[in-house]
């Protein structure tokens, strides 16, 4: 076998391989002998068909199979010998084959980039320092009460905390625009569902009133024909409702799994959940900064094949979230996922180099702790833990999570980490909008 390697462009490589004719003939003969033992041809007993007839009947297909097999096996041998690390599936380009002659073919593929980590000491990370206090728990309890609230009709003017039922007709320069009309539209104030100025125009009005408000569509509005336009909305306010919050009764509290139904028990449960969320938010905040710094400090070429693979994964995930199938996933524009896919590949390659350089292995104690932490959010944590322990794929996924955490900790040990005091609400709001 003769092998030559050339660089096509960037990470692209082409390996050209020549297989000796005698190697091909030897492999073909071996396969024909195997075939002769099992073929059935009228006039001959099984296993006693003359080789010349077997070759006449099956020679072409056997030879084709042998060439395909030799192409793959010799390519594997070649990349091992040349110490090449392909990224993605190779593309085989067969040459012209003539029986009894050497066979030359080429294989085109991309390789993984050579990664040399640098400037890790320049990475800057702000670590949030925050605790859950009583006021945070009070706010969360108020949120829980609002989630369980009922609505009661009122004759009072609408406020920023109320719910309104209304008809509206929107127009620009006197012309009603598409999507600008609605009947019995229920608007919960304060959720930011409408364009700026709409809710403010409703606040202060009572049920039964008819009025007009002037608003401006934002410059970045999703509908091209409405961007930056001034519009009028004729509104009929049919109903205003005020929110009635439930009292912290024993019955209400037990809905949240607090067996004794006490306010103290609910506060303790809420605090525990908030502290778990806080721990995860701090961890993710620090991790994101560390990885952002790693990516900024280390610009690398990315194999297109790996990016395409990630795009396919993201497409399928997006389709699954909205109840789609494989066909619908394939129809989603690749541009929607290209940037995210490229970043995932870059991060994977860089963290992989951190893991390799520092010879990191998944810490089984950390894996166990991660599973226990995740399971604590469920009604029966032990059942979840046992489910994971019996599922090899889930355990391997969790080991990968642990290994990634260990890689990030290695980065943090070299980075400039400063502590920044903050509050629970500030951190969680940053996490939501990030």
From Swiss-Prot:
Keywords: Cell cycle, Cell division, Chaperone, Cytoplasm, Isomerase, Rotamase. This is Trigger factor. Involved in protein export. Acts as a chaperone by maintaining the newly synthesized protein in an open conformation. Functions as a peptidyl-prolyl cis-trans isomerase. The lineage of its organism: Bacteria, Pseudomonadati, Pseudomonadota, Gammaproteobacteria, Enterobacterales. The keyword Glycoprotein does not apply. It catalyses: [protein]-peptidylproline (omega=180) = [protein]-peptidylproline (omega=0). It comes from Yersinia enterocolitica serotype O:8 / biotype 1B (strain NCTC 13174 / 8081). Its EC number is 5.2.1.8. GO terms for biological process: 'de novo' cotranslational protein folding; cell division; chaperone-mediated protein folding; protein transport; protein unfolding. PANTHER family: TRIGGER FACTOR CHAPERONE AND PEPTIDYL-PROLYL CIS/TRANS ISOMERASE, TRIGGER FACTOR-LIKE PROTEIN TIG, CHLOROPLASTIC. The gene is tig. Its main location: cytoplasm. PROSITE patterns: FKBP_PPIASE (PS50059). GO terms for molecular function: peptidyl-prolyl cis-trans isomerase activity; protein folding chaperone; ribosome binding. One of its GO terms (cellular component) is cytoplasm. Coiled coil: none annotated. It is found in: Cytoplasm. Residues 161-246 form the PPIase FKBP-type domain. Consists of 3 domains; the N-terminus binds the ribosome, the middle domain has PPIase activity, while the C-terminus has intrinsic chaperone activity on its own. Belongs to the FKBP-type PPIase family. Tig subfamily.
């Amino acid at each position: 076998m003769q092998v030559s390697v050339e660089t096509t462009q960037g990470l692209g490589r082409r390996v050209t391989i020549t297989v000796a004719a005698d190697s091909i003939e030897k492999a073909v003969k071996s396969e024909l002998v195997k075939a002769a033992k099992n073929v059935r041809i009228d006039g001959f007993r099984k296993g006693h068909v003359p080789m010349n007839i077997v070759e006449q009947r099956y020679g072409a297909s056997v030879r084709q199979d042998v060439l395909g097999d030799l192409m793959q096996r010799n390519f594997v041998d070649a990349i091992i010998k040349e110490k090449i690390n392909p990224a993605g599936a190779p593309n085989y380009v067969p040459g012209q084959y003539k029986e009894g002659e050497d066979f030359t073919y080429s294989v085109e593929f991309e390789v993984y980039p050579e990664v040399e980590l640098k400037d890790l000491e320049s990475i800057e990370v702000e670590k949030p320092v925050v605790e859950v206090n009583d006021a945070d728990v009070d706010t969360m309890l108020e949120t829980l009460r609002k989630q369980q609230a009922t609505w009661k009709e009122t004759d009072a003017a609408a406020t920023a905390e109320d719910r309104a039922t209304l008809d509206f007709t929107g127009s620009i320069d006197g012309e009603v625009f598409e999507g600008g009309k609605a009947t019995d539209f229920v608007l919960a104030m304060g959720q930011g569902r409408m364009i700026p100025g709409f809710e403010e125009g409703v606040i202060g009005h009572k049920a039964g009133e008819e009025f007009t408000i002037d608003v401006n569509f934002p410059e970045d509005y999703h509908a091209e024909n409405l961007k930056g336009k001034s519009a009028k909305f004729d509104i009929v306010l049919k109903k205003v409702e005020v929110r009635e919050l439930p009292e912290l009764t024993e019955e209400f509290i037990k809905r949240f799994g607090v067996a004794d139904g006490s306010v103290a028990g609910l506060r303790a449960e809420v605090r525990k959940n908030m502290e778990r969320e806080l721990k995860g938010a701090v961890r993710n905040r620090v991790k994101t900064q560390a990885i952002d710094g790693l990516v900024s400090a280390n610009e690398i070429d990315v194999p297109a094949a790996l990016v395409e693979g990630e795009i396919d994964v993201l497409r399928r995930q997006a389709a699954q979230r909205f109840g789609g199938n494989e066909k619908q996933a394939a129809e989603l524009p690749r541009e929607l996922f290209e940037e995210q896919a490229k970043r995932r590949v870059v991060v994977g390659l860089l963290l992989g180099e951190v893991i390799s350089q520092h010879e990191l292995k998944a810490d089984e104690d950390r894996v166990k702790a991660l599973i226990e932490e995740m399971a604590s959010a469920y009604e029966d944590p032990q059942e979840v833990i046992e489910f994971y322990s019996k599922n090899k794929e889930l355990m391997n996924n969790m080991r990968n999570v642990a290994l990634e955490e260990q890689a990030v900790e290695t980065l943090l040990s070299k980075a400039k980490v400063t502590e920044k005091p903050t509050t629970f609400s500030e951190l969680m709001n940053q996490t939501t909008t990030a």
